[in-house]
């Protein structure tokens, strides 16, 4: 008989992270309690009636808790239905850095990424470049160096250096 999920996690080597839960994973008791409480709430957070306002308040508290854990602002926390929706949401060539619009020309991904990442989100498929991985599934660092060298490290128009140089340090 297999051990319960939490016991299985405790038995695993601390040097190894088991990530093959596919669409489910063991829940900590506190997470299970919070989930059951949320499932018992009848309100739609977008509704103005009392149940909706209560659901919106619970949703806001959850967003704030996640933001604290991540060191982010609550307004920057978005809940999605799963990895595919999240990848589609964040893999975009257009975003803002402060108030300034920024456009990325290329998305570099590792060949072992989840199919939703390989799809490239809102990037044009021609601008998604796949980097090879080694036998352990790690991105080949030489391929990263080659990719960085293949693109200008600085912009002669505005004197800005690419983030890749910061990452290299």
What positions do the PLM features span?
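Pyridoxal 5′-phosphate
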Residues: 1-169
């Amino acid at each position: 008989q297999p051990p319960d999920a939490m016991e299985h996690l405790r038995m695993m080597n601390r040097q190894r992270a088991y990530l093959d839960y596919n669409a489910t994973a063991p829940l900590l008791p506190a997470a299970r309690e919070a989930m059951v409480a949320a499932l018992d709430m009848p309100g739609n957070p977008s509704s103005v009636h009392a149940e909706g306002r209560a659901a919106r308040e619970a949703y806001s508290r959850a967003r704030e808790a996640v933001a604290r854990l991540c060191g982010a602002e609550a307004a920057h926390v978005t809940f999605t239905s799963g990895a595919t929706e999240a990848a589609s949401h964040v893999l975009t060539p257009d975003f803002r850095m402060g108030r300034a619009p920024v456009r990325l020309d290329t998305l570099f991904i590792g060949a072992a990424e989840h199919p939703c990442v390989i799809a490239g989100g809102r990037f044009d498929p021609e601008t998604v470049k796949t980097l090879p991985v080694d036998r352990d599934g790690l991105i080949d660092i030489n391929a990263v160096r080659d990719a960085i060298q293949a693109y200008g490290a600085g912009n002669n128009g505005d004197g800005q250096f690419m983030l890749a140089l910061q990452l290299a340090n």
